[in-house]
């Protein structure tokens, strides 16, 4: 243990550093211990043996210089060894020069445990703090894992490892099912944009009605109508593929071509065509309304659900543009009509993406999208495992079955068999007949079970996490009082970004009041440690 402060002793000008052990918060720190002035610098701003008066969250205590000198690498030890007031201010949140008191806006309960650490040299875990908050406090005060008492160290490490972390490995924020405060801040920031907009209150109500099904009764009705239109569009697309509709439309198309007319006007059944036009009109109304009511146009085009809405109506308008383009060229021959038919078929195939519009009204689909977004590493590992297994077992099967003429003619042809075998699908269209081939197939199936099961468990756990989190958000909206929500909306009327910054500054004014008034629960004079 370094003894940097000795009563009545002068040091030469030096600047020493103490490398602290790995803090409980998980980051390594290199702490500046002291800057002792040279003998000719004059009188110090405070005596080296003067007791340190601190105020941590309203708890006032006096700490002796000798107790702090035992642990010079901690924040209070460095504060005691500070060579100037400017250096000391960098270590605390505020300083009252008249009372010579240092203020820290930290957890007062942890500070009481910190006082016990300065007396005994051991830090005990507080049950009132979660392991992550405890680690952050310990990191702030400059305590390492070695400071933990032996009776609490194993329990602390076990609790820290058992707590779920954020699914995004790039984030340091602990995982939680509860709504994140940042999400609430983002919503308030978006709603604040309506304060300076024209007809902002009306636009805000319409936006919330279209975006939040649980906001009001009209929003629930709008959601039901939107879901019904999506299901009707999908049903019409499925009915259009039935054989009786295909035969009737093919005959009408042949008759139209023979008469020198475009077959596109007669291919669709009149009822299905009218239903398609109605669905397109509704989808177009949804997209345009959301675009006009959105608080931010840039954020609108960055949202995945809005992109799905655009893709759901894009094929219809592209088909119209293709027909107009060929019509302007005056092409009525079979070649131009054939090209138009291929373009229309491709665009009609894109209508299948309309099923993704249900994600706006489905908690499970949104949770699935969030799971895939945060599981790209696991999905990549799964594909890598499958690729390696398919390549190995396909080569073995080709070697064993190439002479039997049962479909294993080339290694690329064996890839299909290896894929359906490793995924335990087993279509049975290609099967091995030799003993060596059957052994290879058995190994392929068993390897597929083991390989697929490993990352699937992690992905399923992430899906469960995001699903519970999404349900918690929806429950918070449903169970909240409607009048309270209206008060929240009214509070952001006329609010700008500058006013939000002003409110943050105002919220910090209470810190100086703590320095002037003493908490009623505290004794008249700080206790000495």
Swiss-Prot record:
Single GO BP term: action potential
One of the record's GO molecular function terms: delayed rectifier potassium channel activity
Entry protein name: Delayed-rectifier potassium channel regulatory subunit KCNS1
Bilayer-spanning residue ranges: 218-239, 271-293, 305-322, 341-361, 377-398, 439-467
Gene3D superfamilies, per the entry: 1.10.287.70, Potassium Channel Kv1.1, Chain A, Voltage-gated potassium channels. Chain C
Subunit structure as annotated in this protein's UniProt entry: Heterotetramer with KCNB1. Heterotetramer with KCNB2. Does not form homomultimers.
Entry keywords, A to Z: Cell membrane, Ion channel, Ion transport, Membrane, Potassium, Potassium channel, Potassium transport, Transmembrane, Transmembrane helix, Transport, Voltage-gated channel
Protein family membership: Belongs to the potassium channel family. S (TC 1.A.1.2) subfamily. Kv9.1/KCNS1 sub-subfamily.
Membrane topology according to the record: Multi-pass membrane protein
Motif Selectivity filter: positions: 424-429
Entries under InterPro entries matching the protein: BTB/POZ_dom (IPR000210), Ion_trans_dom (IPR005821), K_chnl_volt-dep_Kv (IPR003968), K_chnl_volt-dep_Kv5/Kv9 (IPR003971), SKP1/BTB/POZ_sf (IPR011333), T1-type_BTB (IPR003131), VG_K_chnl (IPR028325), Volt_channel_dom_sf (IPR027359)
């Amino acid at each position: 243990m370094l003894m940097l402060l000795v009563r009545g002793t002068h040091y030469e000008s030096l600047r020493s550093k103490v490398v602290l052990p790995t803090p409980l918060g998980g980051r390594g720190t290199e702490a500046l211990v002291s800057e002792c002035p040279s003998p000719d610098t004059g009188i110090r701003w405070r005596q080296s043996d003067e007791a340190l008066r601190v105020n941590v969250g309203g708890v006032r205590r006096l700490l002796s210089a000798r107790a702090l000198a035992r642990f010079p690498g901690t924040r209070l030890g460095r504060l005691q060894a500070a060579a100037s007031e400017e250096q000391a201010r960098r270590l605390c949140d505020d300083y009252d020069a008249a009372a010579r008191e240092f203020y820290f806006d930290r957890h007062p309960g942890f500070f009481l445990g910190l006082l016990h650490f300065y007396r005994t040299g051991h830090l005990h875990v507080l049950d009132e703090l979660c392991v992550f908050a405890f680690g952050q406090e310990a990191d702030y005060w400059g305590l390492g894992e070695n400071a933990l008492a032996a009776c609490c160290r194993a329990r602390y490490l076990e609790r820290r490892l058992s707590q779920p972390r954020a699914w995004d490995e790039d984030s340091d924020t602990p995982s939680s099912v509860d709504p994140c405060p940042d999400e609430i801040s983002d919503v308030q920031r978006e709603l604040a944009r309506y304060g300076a907009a024209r007809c902002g209150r009306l636009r805000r109500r319409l936006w919330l009605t279209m975006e939040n099904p649980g906001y009001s009764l009209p929003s629930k009705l709008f959601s039901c109508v939107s879901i019904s239109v999506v299901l009707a569009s999908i049903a019409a697309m499925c009915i259009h593929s039935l054989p009786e509709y295909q035969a009737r439309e093919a005959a009408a198309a042949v008759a139209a071509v023979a008469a020198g007319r475009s077959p596109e006007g007669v291919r669709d059944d009149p009822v299905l065509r009218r239903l398609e036009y109605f669905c397109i009109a509704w989808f177009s109304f949804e997209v345009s309304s959301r675009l006009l009511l959105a608080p931010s146009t840039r954020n609108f085009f960055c949202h995945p659900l809005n992109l799905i809405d655009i893709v759901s109506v894009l094929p219809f308008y592209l088909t119209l543009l293709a027909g107009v383009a060929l019509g302007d060229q005056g092409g009525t021959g079979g070649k131009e009509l054939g090209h138009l038919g291929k373009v229309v078929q491709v665009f009609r195939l894109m209508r299948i993406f309309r099923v993704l519009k249900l994600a706006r009204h489905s908690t499970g689909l949104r949770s699935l999208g969030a799971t895939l977004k945060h599981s790209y590493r696991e999905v990549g590992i799964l594909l890598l495992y499958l690729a390696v297994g398919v390549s190995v077992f396909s080569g073995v099967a080709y070697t064993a079955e190439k002479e039997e003429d049962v479909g294993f003619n080339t290694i690329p042809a064996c890839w299909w068999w290896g894929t359906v075998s490793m995924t335990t699908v087993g279509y049975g269209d290609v099967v091995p007949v030799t003993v060596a081939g059957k052994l290879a197939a058995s190994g392929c199936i068993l390897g597929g079970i083991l390989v697929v099961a490993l990352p699937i468990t992690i992905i399923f756990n992430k899906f469960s996490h995001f699903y519970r989190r999404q349900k918690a958000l929806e429950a918070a909206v449903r169970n909240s009082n409607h009048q309270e929500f209206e008060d929240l909306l009214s509070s952001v009327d006329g609010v700008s970004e500058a006013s939000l910054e002003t409110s943050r500054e105002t919220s910090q004014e209470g810190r100086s009041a703590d320095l002037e008034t003493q908490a009623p629960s505290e004794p008249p004079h700080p206790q000495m440690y």
